[in-house]
Swiss-Prot record:
Efflux pump involved in export of fusaric acid, a mycotoxin with low to moderate toxicity to animals and humans, but with high phytotoxic properties. Constitutes a self-protecting mechanism of the fungus against critical levels of FSA within the cell. This is Efflux pump FUBT. It holds the Pfam family MFS_1. Belongs to the major facilitator superfamily. DHA1 family. Polyamines/proton antiporter (TC 2.A.1.2.16) subfamily. The gene is FUBT. It comes from Fusarium oxysporum (Fusarium vascular wilt).
């Protein structure tokens, strides 16, 4: 059952980083597929065709195409998406794309909602198990600690097994663990289940942005990311509001039941409606099944020039590479520390607000949760602000007529860096019971507004600065900020008892104030700093190569090239030092003679 190879012309290519950097030139170096002529057409048996079409949602016309290659192991057929391929996520109708973004944002909301909703039932957990406040707070910290490890594992697995399979498995198990937590018989089992739920349920935190990248090109991606970016912050802010009332009225077990129901409904909705979107996985599976059906050898054009990568290799890179970049690149380290401080401050609020509003003002558990309304308003304001910022950036890029610099992403971070300490100091010194309760809550509006502005702007800055290393950079940033988010609530009570409400609330404000110069420095000197950073400089070289030669470079290729450049520079510097030392010895000997 042969499919004769025919000469081909360029056709529509799938979305890659190269598409983003090259622009709209999708017609370079991609094999095309053309309908077979009647005389050459070989028909796949109807039974096999039906099975293949039902299982993999492709039509007979796809199998009947001609592809470059000979169908052998040495020269396999190279397949790509058809121009009107229904499985190409880039070609989905706009309303479907936005519906899928909404569903994935809801999945992230469900995950982060559960991280803080637990705080609404902490008093009941303390009474039920006879434990201290600090031990009960571990339910928040261990859940957020799961965010450190989960995305490092689920992100590479989603590239091997597809976004849909990873989401289906992780959210199914997270729903089961969340339901199990509702029936926990001891504090140990509750805490273990909380950690496992956070680790396994954190898949959308890394896979949702990847799904957005699968569906949207660079010109539209900013608005989609803006919509998604609110979920990781709205969830923690809404959690105590709902959790406070439910925990007070029905107890902590019903509160965990609500988390399980929220996760379960989201799991069903996303599984039913969102298709697989990752192009390399779709084409890889399609090639495998066509090889089985026809007896010929097929390969995806996206995998044709790459060595096969095992799950163990990808997991090793995913677990080690982010830390390498974090500690070797000053830009990554400084921005990640800044984001981690303000992210940890947000989670510190879950331990601090009950002290300020319930203990200090005598509010009930349910009413105390409403204190987080200010954070909700601040997050909404930041999303609106970023929608306008996205339009400003697009207009500036159009006027310039040339690629924008990464530093052009920083104006929102400059504004946000000022709003954060203003909001935190405002909150800290208006928490006196004699001051109206609305005043400190207004301070949290400015804090949350600035928090999301800084978060989004600095992440965009890192992505634009490191391009091909973006996945590892995001993993490093996510891991570090999750560690801070897990740690901050654990020492909050002791800090407030020792320093008092006002000075304890001022500590994160002083930390944020110390970080204010960073966005300004990066805006003014960022380019010079980047060119002195090993991997940032290599990313710039790769970006230039992709723009000029219209080639796609993988993260592994770029990492290897960067390491080779570093070894070459090290060797040259050692050789130069040895030569200089030898020259000095020669001069010394000449003088002595």
């Amino acid at each position: 059952m042969a499919i004769d190879p025919q000469p081909s012309s360029p056709s529509l290519s799938s979305e890659t980083i190269a598409n983003d950097t090259i622009g709209n030139d999708n017609n370079v170096n991609e094999p095309s597929v053309e309908p077979k002529t009647q005389e050459n057409q070989h028909t796949v048996p109807p039974r096999l065709s039906r099975i293949y079409s039902q299982a993999h949602h492709i039509s007979q016309s796809f199998i009947d195409q001609n592809y470059p290659g000979e169908g052998t192991t040495q020269a396999p057929y190279r397949i790509n998406f058809l121009p009107d391929d229904t499985q190409n996520a880039q070609l989905l109708p706009r309303w479907k794309k936005w519906a899928f973004v909404l569903l994935q944002s809801l999945a992230c909301l469900a995950t982060t909602f559960a991280s803080s909703a637990y705080s609404g039932g902490i008093k009941q957990v303390i009474r039920a198990f006879g434990i201290s406040q600090e031990v009960a707070t571990l339910g928040i910290s261990l859940y957020v600690l799961g965010f450190t490890f989960g995305p490092l594992i689920w992100a590479p697995l989603s590239e091997l097994y597809g976004r849909k399979k990873v989401f289906f498995f992780t959210f199914m198990v997270a729903t089961a663990f969340s339901a199990g937590a509702a029936g926990a018989g001891s504090i140990a089992s509750l805490l273990v289940l909380r950690f496992l739920t956070g680790s396994i349920g954190s898949a959308p935190l890394s896979n949702a942005p990847a799904l957005i990248a699968d569906m949207f090109d660079k010109s539209e991606r900013g608005l989609a990311m803006c919509m998604f970016s609110g979920a990781p912050f709205l969830g923690p802010a809404i959690g105590p509001i709902a959790g406070g009332f439910l925990g007070e009225a029905a107890g902590w077990r019903w509160l965990h039941g609500l988390m399980a129901a929220f996760t379960g409904v989201t799991w069903i909705a996303c599984t039913v409606f969102i298709p697989e979107t990752y192009a390399p996985y779709i084409l890889r599976k399609r090639a495998q099944h066509m090889s089985k059906l026809t007896g010929k050898v097929y390969i995806s054009t996206l995998d044709a020039d790459k060595p096969p990568s095992s799950a163990a290799h990808q997991l090793k890179n995913a677990l080690t590479r982010p830390w390498l970049l974090l500690f070797k690149e000053p830009i990554v380290f400084i921005t990640s520390i800044y984001i981690s401080i303000i992210y940890g401050t947000m989670y510190m609020c879950f331990a601090a607000f009950p002290i300020v509003f319930q203990k200090g003002r005598g509010w009930s558990q349910g009413i105390g949760g409403l204190a987080f309304t200010g954070i909700v308003i601040g997050v909404v304001l930041s999303i609106i602000s970023f929608a306008f910022e996205d339009k400003r950036y697009a207009r500036a890029a159009q006027r310039r007529g040339a690629p924008m610099e990464p530093e052009d992403r920083l104006p929102p971070a400059i504004m946000g860096s000022l709003l954060i300490p203003i909001g935190l100091f405002w909150f800290a010194w208006t928490t006196f019971p004699s001051v109206h309760w609305i005043v400190p809550i207004i301070g949290t509006v400015f804090f949350a507004w600035g928090l999301v502005l800084v978060f989004m702007a600095l992440l965009n800055y890192l992505i634009d600065s490191y391009v091909i290393f973006a996945a590892s950079i995001m993993a490093a940033n996510s891991a570090l900020r999750s560690l801070f988010g897990a740690a901050f609530p654990l020492f909050t009570r002791q800090m407030y008892d020792g320093l008092g409400v006002q000075w304890a609330s001022s500590i994160p404000a002083f930390l944020a104030l110390a970080c204010v110069p960073f966005p300004f420095l990066f805006y003014k000197y960022g380019r010079q700093i980047r060119m002195k950073c090993e991997y940032a400089a290599e990313a710039a070289n790769v970006l230039q190569k992709m723009r000029s030669l219209h080639v796609t470079v993988t993260e592994d290729d770029a990492m290897n090239e960067a390491e080779e450049m570093w070894r070459a520079r090290t060797h040259n510097s050692h050789a130069s030092a040895a030569h200089s030392h030898g020259h000095r010895r020669s001069l010394s000997y000449t003088r002595s003679v």
